[in-house]
């Protein structure tokens, strides 16, 4: 095999992609700029350095990321194998000794006969087969190259996302379907508030705890995308003239205009997930849950992705990537990791796994690998390439709302998740036999 692949970035996604390629006999140049050039967030020269938490989140199959991890175990994931080896006590979560974890991955890749490690900065996308996995702190020159090849409106430099919730957890008796002024089809679920309910909500927002901002995120990335708690600080009426404006949203049950309205917009093609419109936020997750559950209809809501505002570099994947994490119209260029719109350590590694396997199959002329949507790894790939709201695409983590509904509705959440997990692993194992 003379064909050599360039994998740019040795984070979780790049490390996984390089390993999957190398295990299939493909020669790989794994290019990592550290330690020649450090990022503001990294501190070592190790691959797959965990820059925030040392937890890879839940390990149980009643947890979406737990299902994703189990799927990756079935697919010989370097990242999950390393995490299992470096595991430290953390209850039901998979937490690791971050030094052992990164050390095991680094040693495995540096000693792999099919991998050549190059420590240098990449300012231009290499020629030939390439996977870009440079993460949220992609350097300016490479980011400009990505803009040039994907289009000027297809690369974002910050992540300003409103919370995303499960439709099944909304109290539909308290909300109504309507678009403002009845324009177009009724596309929003509306949560009406009385003045008393709004005041209670407003006071809670002002008292809610805000998350600290990392030093390297303090530049002003959020023009035109203000956190709703900052709007609230500007005065009680600011939200009423902003995201909670009730004009044109009269309640069809009463014919009257509510004092305030929180709008929910469909977020996925299947209609199982909704985002809270205009509620991008810096609040801590616990505070978000408390505040959101004060909204009528959302008292018992399940939040699958909390609102965030932080520096990120990610592409508008539904417009430019397919389910193989391949750039549309470019059969030699793939992307992986957070820059594809997946959110989280495990999700990033999973995208690298899919990109690596697919590029290996392309080189070996073995056909494309599209994992079933019933699997968590397949549903993530489907989401980033088919998100309903592609004009305001925001990163997503693994959650059961991405999976197709079960044929038979199961009301008990734990039982439903267990059934979806069992189905996911059955579909994965059946699909593996075709690879």
UniProtKB/Swiss-Prot annotation:
NCBIfam families: gid_trmFO, PRK05335.1. It catalyses: uridine(54) in tRNA + (6R)-5,10-methylene-5,6,7,8-tetrahydrofolate + NADH + H(+) = 5-methyluridine(54) in tRNA + (6S)-5,6,7,8-tetrahydrofolate + NAD(+); uridine(54) in tRNA + (6R)-5,10-methylene-5,6,7,8-tetrahydrofolate + NADPH + H(+) = 5-methyluridine(54) in tRNA + (6S)-5,6,7,8-tetrahydrofolate + NADP(+). Its EC number is 2.1.1.74. Keywords: Cytoplasm, FAD, Flavoprotein, Methyltransferase, NAD, NADP, Transferase, tRNA processing. It is found in: Cytoplasm. It comes from Staphylococcus epidermidis (strain ATCC 35984 / DSM 28319 / BCRC 17069 / CCUG 31568 / BM 3577 / RP62A). Its main location: cytoplasm. This is Methylenetetrahydrofolate--tRNA-(uracil-5-)-methyltransferase TrmFO. PROSITE patterns: GIDA_2 (PS01281). Its cofactor is FAD.
């Amino acid at each position: 095999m003379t064909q050599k692949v360039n994998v740019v970035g040795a984070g979780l996604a790049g490390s996984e992609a390089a390993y999957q390629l190398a295990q299939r006999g493909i020669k790989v140049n794994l290019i990592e700029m550290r330690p020649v050039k450090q990022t503001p967030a990294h501190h070592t020269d190790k691959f797959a350095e965990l820059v925030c938490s040392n937890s890879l989140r839940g390990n149980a199959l009643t947890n979406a990321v737990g299902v994703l991890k189990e799927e990756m175990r079935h697919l010989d994931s370097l990242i999950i194998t390393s995490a299992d080896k470096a595991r430290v006590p953390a209850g039901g979560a998979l937490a690791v000794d971050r030094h052992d974890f990164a050390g095991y991955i680094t040693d495995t890749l540096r000693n792999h006969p099919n991998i050549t490690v190059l420590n240098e900065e990449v300012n231009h996308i290499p020629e030939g087969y390439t996977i870009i996995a440079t993460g949220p702190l992609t350097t300016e020159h490479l980011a400009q190259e990505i803009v040039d090849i994907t289009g000027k409106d297809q690369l974002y430099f910050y992540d300003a996302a409103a919370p995303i919730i499960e439709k099944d957890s909304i109290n539909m008796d308290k909300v109504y379907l309507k678009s403002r002024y009845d324009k177009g089809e009724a596309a929003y679920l509306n949560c009406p508030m009385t003045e008393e309910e709004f005041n209670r909500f407003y006071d809670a927002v002002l008292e809610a705890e805000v998350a600290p901002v990392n030093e390297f995120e303090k530049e002003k990335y959020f023009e035109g995308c203000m956190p709703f708690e900052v709007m609230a600080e500007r005065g009680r009426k600011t939200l009423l003239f902003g995201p909670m404006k009730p004009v044109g949203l009269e309640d069809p049950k009463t014919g009257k205009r509510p004092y305030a309205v929180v709008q929910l917009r469909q977020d996925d093609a299947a209609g199982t997930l909704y985002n809270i419109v205009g509620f991008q936020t810096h609040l801590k997750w616990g505070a978000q849950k408390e505040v959101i559950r004060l909204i009528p209809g959302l008292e018992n809501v399940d939040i699958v992705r909390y609102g965030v505002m932080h520096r990120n570099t990610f592409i508008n994947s539904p417009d430019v990537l397919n389910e193989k994490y391949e750039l549309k119209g470019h059969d030699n260029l793939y992307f992986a990791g957070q820059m594809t719109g997946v959110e989280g350590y495990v999700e990033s590694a999973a995208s690298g796994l899919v990109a690596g396997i697919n590029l290996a199959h392309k080189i070996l002329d073995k056909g494309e690998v599209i994992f079933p949507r019933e699997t968590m790894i397949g549903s993530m790939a489907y989401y980033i390439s088919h998100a309903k709201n592609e004009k305001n695409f925001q990163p997503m983590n693994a959650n059961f709302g991405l999976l197709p509904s079960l044929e038979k509705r199961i009301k008990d959440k734990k039982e439903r998740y267990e059934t979806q997990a069992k189905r996911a692993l059955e579909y994965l194992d059946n699909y593996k036999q075709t690879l």
